[in-house]
């Protein structure tokens, strides 16, 4: 009887060891949408590779729209929203973990990007804080406070909040 329990315990340990992982070396696809000061809307699609202790590298594509009030109707109309100022960028960010909890963790986000608006080249330096909430199945919700320094952009500083979801790839 004791030999049977030992074998059963070993099988259970091996099964849990094979299927369980502590969220290291995992890959995620994330989508975030947010509002930035002043009159900006931000959309970010990114691939994130997480290493040990929740430190991560993020490769991202970012789109930005800055809307204005229409001169003729004094409201925000489709013309003044979609065609006022637009930019896009591609970049990389390193995210070291600074806070860890049971089902959440926080990262400082440090990165750089290159892109364009409709007329010229843009460079960007990105700083911020991202807090992640881990759900079942590896899904994550995140809230990101970001500040972007845009070189040669219409607006030098962009700051705001982005909310999003991360989907596991492996």
Where do the model's predicted regions map?
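Cleavable N-terminal export/targeting peptides
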Residues: 1-26, 169-170
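Charged helix-capping and loop-helix junction motifs
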Residues: 125-127
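Short coil turns and loop connectors of transmembrane beta-barrels in diderm outer membranes
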Residues: 25-27, 39, 53-55, 100-104, ...
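A broad helix-preferring feature
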Residues: 13-19, 106-108, 130
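Generic structural signal for beta-strand residues in well-ordered domains
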Residues: 15, 24, 48-50, 97-101, ...
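Outer-membrane beta-barrel translocator/channel fold
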Residues: 58-117, 123, 132-133, 141-168
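Short glycine/proline- and aromatic-enriched beta-strand/turn motifs that initiate or cap beta-hairpins
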Residues: 21-67, 166-170
């Amino acid at each position: 009887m004791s030999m049977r329990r030992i074998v059963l315990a070993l099988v259970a340990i091996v099964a849990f060891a094979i299927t369980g992982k502590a969220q290291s070396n995992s890959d995620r696809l994330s989508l975030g949408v947010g509002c930035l000061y002043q009159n900006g809307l931000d959309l970010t699609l990114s691939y994130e590779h997480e290493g040990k202790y929740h430190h991560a590298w993020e490769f991202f594509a970012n789109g930005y729209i800055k809307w204005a009030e229409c001169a003729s109707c004094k409201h925000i109309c489709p013309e003044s929203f979609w065609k006022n100022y637009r930019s896009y960028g591609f970049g990389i960010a390193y995210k070291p973990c600074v806070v860890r909890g049971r089902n959440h963790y926080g990262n400082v986000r440090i990165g750089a990007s290159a892109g364009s608006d409709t007329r010229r080249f843009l460079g960007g330096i990105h700083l911020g804080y991202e807090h992640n909430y881990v759900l079942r199945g590896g899904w994550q919700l995140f809230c990101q406070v970001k500040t972007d320094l845009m070189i040669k952009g219409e607006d030098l500083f962009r700051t705001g909040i982005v909310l999003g979801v991360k989907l596991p790839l492996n």
